[in-house]
Curated annotation (Swiss-Prot):
Glycan attachment residues as annotated in the record: N6
Protein name: Transmembrane protein 138
Primary location group: membrane
Annotated compartments: Vacuole membrane; Cell projection, Cilium
Name of the encoding gene: tmem138
Amino acid sequence: MLQTNNYSLVLLIQLALLTFDLFVNSFSELLRSAPVIQLVLFIIQDIGILFNVIIILLMMFNTYVFQVGLVSLLLERFRAMLILSALYLTLSICFHCWVMNLRWMESNRFVWTDGLQVLFVFQRIAAVLYYYFYKRTTEYLGDPRLYEDSPWLRDAFARARQ
């Protein structure tokens, strides 16, 4: 079971990773003259997104709902967040690779092609949705009802067995 102290620590780590992600999304263009630093920030950002997904999955695996075998209930509840996380990670990696590829040798040259601008917009829209769904999922996974036996869980288990 996820204890209050542990949940607070996990929540703090998750929010720190989300804050760093938001920081990189907001200010990475200011570092276009230093491509190595920008590359390192992009790599750390992508690893942070991956860590956030791993943390959410570990929190899901820790629930009583998962342990009694109602994985479909969890997947139904968190499908949007899992899909958005994968989409956001994919869009971020694609955007980072494309920007660094265009900007590596000539960092002060205008590199914003039409395709890159479209990818940028989709990546930022996915980022906003990712932040919202991730925070909502994190708060929902803090619900103590997910970590203990309860009547609604017994009803869900009975429906799943039929």
